[in-house]
């Protein structure tokens, strides 16, 4: 894999990380708007995404892995997203994406539609204000699995349907071009793929 097949995210990027990312043509996904000036010191990414904190998050495995919401330390908070994309556009970047992390180990199918709606409201307003479009939207992960016998598994079909319904409605509401939708299944694929033997 290389180039735009790779989305490069990181919290603590070194100058070398940035230079190698620019040289290889990967998609830069910035976790903090303050990283943009550092990246621009070395060059201009062809495609830029920000990790948007939708202002709400949930975790079924403890509050320290909530990943989104008012107290989360990751992602661009809702009130700073417009300024982040405005700065990127002003710097001459023309191709954009958006990313979020909705939470961790969520097994409530309707939650994914809800959190997608929050993200779409934020970036829909950004797109309309700045007259930019989003080539892709990475809805992150958070797809949960049961860890105890009494826990119900995630209904993945219902989660997909809820997400698609909300996404279509918001695209129409904000007059957005349909983006490529992506997810990061992570734990959902590998979390129950083996046994821990002690």
Residue ranges and their predicted role:
Residues 24-25, 32-94:
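Conserved anion-binding
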Residues 3-5, 22-27, 62-76, 108-113, ...:
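Glycine-rich tight-turn/loop motif centered on a GG-T
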Residues 87-107:
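Gly/Ser/Thr-enriched, mixed-charge loops and adjacent short helices
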Residues 104-198:
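C-terminal active-site-proximal or functional interface alpha/beta core segments in diverse enzymes
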Residues 1-24, 38, 60:
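N-terminal active-site wall of soluble small-molecule enzyme domains
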Residues 4-10, 26-30, 48-52, 95-102, ...:
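Hydrophobic faces of well-ordered beta-strands that scaffold small-molecule active sites
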Residues 15, 19, 23, 33-41, ...:
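Amphipathic, non-transmembrane alpha-helical secondary structure
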Residues 12-14, 32-34, 52-56, 78, ...:
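Active-site-proximal loop/turn and secondary-structure-junction residues that shape catalytic pockets
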């Amino acid at each position: 894999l290389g180039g735009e097949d790779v989305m490069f995210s990181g919290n603590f990027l070194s100058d070398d990380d940035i230079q190698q990312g620019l040289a290889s043509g990967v998609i830069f996904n910035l976790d903090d708007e303050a990283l943009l000036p550092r990246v621009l010191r070395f060059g201009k990414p062809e495609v830029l995404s920000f990790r948007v904190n939708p202002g709400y998050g949930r975790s079924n495995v403890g509050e320290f892995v909530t990943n989104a919401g008012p107290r989360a330390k990751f992602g661009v908070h809702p009130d700073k997203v417009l300024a982040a994309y405005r700065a990127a556009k002003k710097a001459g970047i023309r191709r954009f994406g958006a990313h979020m992390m909705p939470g961790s180990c969520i097994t409530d199918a309707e939650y994914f539609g809800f959190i997608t709606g929050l993200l779409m409201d934020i970036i829909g307003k950004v797109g309309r204000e700045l007259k930019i479009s989003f080539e892709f939207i990475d809805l992150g992960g958070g797809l949960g699995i049961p860890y105890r016998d009494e826990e119900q598994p995630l209904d993945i079909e219902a989660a997909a349907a809820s997400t698609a319904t909300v996404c279509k409605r918001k695209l129409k509401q904000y007059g957005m071009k349909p983006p490529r939708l992506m997810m990061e299944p992570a734990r959902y694929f590998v979390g129950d793929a083996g046994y821990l033997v002690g």
